[in-house]
A protein has these predicted regions:
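Structured, hydrophobic secondary-structure cores that serve as assembly/anchoring elements
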Residues: 1-242
């Protein structure tokens, strides 16, 4: 209801008896929860972390590393970049409870669970960018949801300056002059491919002391799949003709 934050949920990786859940059982848990929201996300499996203060290893939900990487992403890039992958998704985990195979990761991702993947050279990595929204739209990606959260925050901060000014053409132009640069800067920083801001004011809305702005955006999607095709040509082939 707040519409101003992303909620990272914990998905259990053992049952009530402490028996490890399978990938399919984890997906079933999320499905049975009936959560359908682009303001929430979840990750799996749990991670073994080194508790240096007590000199022991402990199992923790991946939430702790996810939040760290979200903060890292905000510091080294922008909220509309995915907090995932080898650049912004590496963790401090000793190991994951389950070492996921490729088909395991695919099953989890299709089930709206972001996998904690294990790679021999870098360790455990956040390898997903999905929200818990069921419908396939731009908003079932975390970076797009966080883009909108940031844009709303920035636009709200400048729009409040106009409250109690005269509701006329001058204030409408001021609104556009404040909002357009914000979105243009996001576009320059690779968060949007295009945008448009319009004002939809009617005599009735003016009489209600309202200014109605509409923001249309084309968010930049994250790259999640790379397809590489190799072609063998004859020795005498001219690449310019291909």
């Amino acid at each position: 209801d707040r519409a101003d934050s992303l909620y990272v949920l914990t998905t259990p990786d053992t049952d009530s008896d402490g028996v490890a859940l399978s990938v399919g059982e984890a997906v079933d848990l999320v499905e049975d929860s009936a959560i359908d929201s682009n303001y929430s996300a979840t990750y799996w499996p749990w991670l073994q972390m080194n508790d240096t203060e007590n000199n022991k290893y402990v199992w923790l939900p991946p939430t702790v590393e996810v939040m760290r990487n979200i903060a890292l992403t905000d510091n080294v890039a922008f909220p509309w970049f995915a907090a995932a992958g080898l650049n912004r998704g590496t963790t401090n985990a000793v190991k994951a409870r389950v070492k996921l195979r490729l088909d395991d990761r695919d099953t989890l991702y299709e089930g709206r669970i972001n996998p904690m993947a294990t790679f021999s050279d870098v360790g455990v990595v956040i390898f997903g960018n999905k929200t818990l929204q069921v419908k396939e739209t731009a908003l079932n990606r975390i970076n797009v949801r966080r883009l909108l959260l940031q844009a709303r925050k920035l636009i709200s901060a400048v729009s409040i300056r106009l409250l109690f000014e005269q509701n006329d053409e001058v204030v409408r132009n001021q609104f556009l002059s404040l909002v357009n640069p914000i979105l243009d800067n996001i576009r320059k920083e690779r968060g949007l491919t295009d945008f448009r801001v319009t004002l939809d004011d009617t005599p009735e809305s003016i009489d209600r002391n309202e200014l109605n702005g509409r923001v249309f955006i084309k968010p930049t999607r994250s790259l999640e799949y790379i397809s590489i095709e190799f072609n063998i040509t004859n020795t005498g082939a001219n690449f310019d003709d291909i």
